[in-house]
């Protein structure tokens, strides 16, 4: 009888030990996962390329780039006729030269924006921290978070980002630009009077308050107005615009801003700030600066738009991109007389780093450069 009691007590003690051990392991594992979740982005920013081997650069891009399609992609697209849209082409080519690339990001913020950790922990321009109420108020009125139904239904989307560079002048690329399904324009770059070189079609116009066109008649019909929020005042400004409230010109802007945008709320979108974050830290390698806006760590709107297009388009092209610092007297933009030397005065952008990033994409045929400025 005593032996049975001893065996029973031994088994109970063993079971208790196993249960405690399991609970301890589970708690440790949960803590580890939580730590990994909260630090994975920072780790990826600090150690990009270090675990990929010597064939990749410090950011994680393939060092030896050429225009030859990888074998599996050459097979996949072998039967496509010249000029036919190739589904998934841009993201597949991007992944081939940059294995860390993935497509988790929607183009625009929707009503689930607070659930996405990648932008929740950063203040503008790299995230939405502190902007919940403003964004919620805007989205409650716009109620549209995607492209138009016609564009959303396309089996394959060909997109072009039209930059503002002087390299567009006298190139006569207008008809080729208009052939794309989605034509993305930036800030206040005009179309009227320049159609021969820049086309007449506009699908999206991405801007921030200081860059937005100030005269209502300049806005194109049938285009979406997309805010790129670089500071909290930008979201406040958009709320004024959407609710048709009075805009104060002294609300923290560095120049005068539009007081009215002739778009109905369903024609207005908020660009997902993840693309600003990804362009800056992951793809271009700008200084992290604790996730805050600082000197030389803000990507140009052109690079942000390219990053967005890599996520949302099957094929991506650009036109009007490229700054040639060796020609300081060349026109900076196709529509004005400001000279190239003016870009050197910018303290927020790192033009050389951006040029290196875009050249990688062009060389590897991830994107097409119609104006050959990159």
Curated annotation (Swiss-Prot):
| InterPro entries on file | Glyco_trans_29, Glycosyltransferase_29, GT29-like_sf, Sialyl_trans
Specify the superkingdom. Eukaryota
Per the record, the pathway is: Protein modification; protein glycosylation
Q: Which GO terms describe its molecular function?
A: beta-galactoside (CMP) alpha-2,3-sialyltransferase activity; N-acetyllactosaminide alpha-2,3-sialyltransferase activity
Keywords from UniProt, A to Z, are: Disulfide bond, Glycoprotein, Glycosyltransferase, Golgi apparatus, Membrane, Signal-anchor, Transferase, Transmembrane, Transmembrane helix
Give residue ranges on the Cytoplasmic side. Answer: 1-8
Is-annotated flag, keyword Amino-acid biosynthesis? no
Cited Pfam families:
Glyco_transf_29 (PF00777)
Q: Which residues cross the membrane?
A: 9-28
Q: How is activity influenced by pH?
A: Optimum pH is 6.4.
Give the catalysed reaction(s), semicolon-separated: a beta-D-galactosyl-(1->4)-N-acetyl-beta-D-glucosaminyl derivative + CMP-N-acetyl-beta-neuraminate = an N-acetyl-alpha-neuraminyl-(2->3)-beta-D-galactosyl-(1->4)-N-acetyl-beta-D-glucosaminyl derivative + CMP + H(+)
Where it sits in the cell: the answer is: Membrane; Golgi apparatus, Golgi stack membrane
Might you report a single GO cellular component term? Answer: Golgi cisterna membrane
**Which cysteine pairs make disulfide bonds?**
159-313
* Class of enzymatic activity (EC top level): transferase
Summarize tissue expression: Found in all tissues tested. High expression found in brain, liver, kidney, colon, heart and spleen.
Task: List all annotated glycosylation positions.
Answer: 79, 170
Q: Which GO terms describe its biological process?
A: ganglioside biosynthetic process via lactosylceramide; protein glycosylation
| Membrane association type | Single-pass type II membrane protein
Instruction: Give the family, as the similarity comment puts it.
Output: Belongs to the glycosyltransferase 29 family.
**Function per UniProt:** Catalyzes the formation of the NeuAc-alpha-2,3-Gal-beta-1,4-GlcNAc-, NeuAc-alpha-2,3-Gal-beta-1,3-GlcNAc- and NeuAc-alpha-2,3-Gal-beta-1,3-GalNAc- sequences found in terminal carbohydrate groups of glycoproteins and glycolipids. The highest activity is toward Gal-beta-1,3-GlcNAc and the lowest toward Gal-beta-1,3-GalNAc.
State what protein this is by name. Answer: CMP-N-acetylneuraminate-beta-1,4-galactoside alpha-2,3-sialyltransferase
Annotated source species: Mus musculus
Task: Cite the source lineage.
Answer: Eukaryota, Metazoa, Chordata, Craniata, Vertebrata
State the encoding gene. St3gal3
